[in-house]
Regions:
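Alpha-helical multi-pass membrane segments and their bilayer interfacial helix-loop junctions
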Residues: 1-399
């Protein structure tokens, strides 16, 4: 039943003494207000903002400096004030969309004014200013649209800093961790945790490679994300950070299989006391937390974080760890009859088998024969594993 219609009708029922006011409130509690997500309005704001930027850019050279400043300041003020008024008096989603346009205008104004007065920034500082305003709007209006806007601005700014200037912008990083990080750990909403985790992974990659750090520091950063979920997020929540950290380090091991034997990569693997100290502390906490868990099988995930780059055959050891990881999850899933573990092990095993086959057979086997045998092998493995998975799924549970 439509809640708005129920509100009107129930008021009449109270007036006609059909129900009491208490009963009316209990009835309305069964039909809570729907939280409408203004997706269309958000895209509308985005397109209007892009239309503004396109118009200004196409006519920018024909305007005087005074005319340019008037257009930017007027647009920014009008959109923000109208958005604030509409938000408070009329419609919150429409108001948010107008304020979002103002945020886009503000960001573009930073770069346009810099171009107008021939100011060149050799860092991501303009993105930092833009992020501060976006984060401030998020704190004021408490709307998730501004959370994602802030996250996108920070991530794009950090990517820009890394690719263009080969530098990690420390202030963007601090605002990301202390600002958005604090919020996602407090809210614990899956979509926001996932978005933050993806951005964290990109930040870690940019930090390591733009600052000339050895690539293996990524293991510590991914392990940190894994540990954060163990100690700062409540039990029973969705394993968002852990899943992202596992996917990231799994991908890293795959790359090690192909490139760790390369001479150039070998030069990057000089031992680092600080790395092993950080890794040992994080790994210790992970092991302790895993031992304290009611489901002790999650120690299998920690195998992926073992640093094998210091060994001469690090590429083969990386492949061995991938096989061991997938087989242990398969065996554990079959023993405990947990279909989710079987699914995880199945996917990991098929990927690892294909990687091993590709690594070992690509150089000497005829290409057509290579793909034919590989396809038949994967088909046979998938058939066998799917048959076992269905058997488990019929009586298996989730852990």
């Amino acid at each position: 039943m439509n809640r708005d219609h129920l509100v009107k009708e129930s008021r009449k029922w109270v007036e006609d003494a059909i129900i009491s006011e208490v009963q009316r409130e209990q009835l309305l509690e069964r039909y809570p207000k729907k939280q409408n997500k203004p997706v269309l309005l958000t895209f509308a704001a985005l397109f209007i903002g892009l239309a503004f930027l396109t118009f200004v850019a196409s006519n920018w050279s024909y305007l005087t400096d005074l005319g340019r400043m008037v257009i930017l300041l007027t647009s920014l003020t009008v959109f923000y004030l109208c958005g604030d008024w509409v938000y408070r008096k009329k419609s919150k989603p429409v108001g948010i969309s107008l304020i979002m346009i103002a945020l886009l205008v503000f960001g573009s104004s930073i770069f346009l004014v810099g171009q107008m007065y021939h100011y060149t920034s050799y860092s991501a500082f303009p993105f930092f200013l833009w992020s501060i305003v976006a984060f401030g709007l998020f704190l004021i209006f408490k709307d998730h649209s501004f959370f994602y806007a802030t996250l996108v601005i920070m991530t794009v700014g950090q990517l820009y800093s890394g690719f263009v200037f080969q530098h990690f912008h420390i202030w963007l990083g601090l605002l990301f961790i202390l600002g958005l990080g604090w919020f996602v750990l407090s809210s614990r909403k899956v979509t926001q945790l996932a978005a933050f985790g993806v951005s964290y992974t990109l930040h870690a990659v940019i930090l390591v490679f733009s600052e000339g750090m050895p690539y293996y520091w990524l293991i510590a950063f991914f392990l940190l994300l894994y540990v954060v979920e163990d100690f700062l997020l409540e039990k029973g929540s969705v394993r968002v950070f852990k899943t992202l950290s596992i996917l990231s380090v799994f991908t890293m091991l795959v790359l090690q299989v192909f490139f760790l034997g390369n001479e150039y990569v070998g030069e990057l693997t000089e031992s680092s006391l600080y790395f092993f100290l950080a890794w040992a502390i994080l790994f210790f906490f992970s092991v302790v937390r895993s031992a304290m868990s009611s489901t002790n099988y999650y120690w299998i995930d920690l195998l992926l974080f073992v640093p094998v780059f210091r060994f001469e055959s690090g590429d083969m050891l990386s492949l061995l760890i991938l096989f061991l990881y997938s087989l242990l999850w398969l065996i554990s899933g079959y023993q405990q009859e947990v279909s989710r573990w079987v699914n995880k092990g199945t996917v990991a095993f098929l990927l690892t088998t294909f990687i091993a086959y590709f690594q070992l057979a690509w150089d000497f086997m005829d290409r057509s024969l290579f793909f034919l045998i590989g396809g038949v092998l994967l088909f046979a493995l998938s058939y066998f594993l799917e048959k076992k998975r269905r058997t488990i799924h019929k009586g298996g549970g989730e852990k």
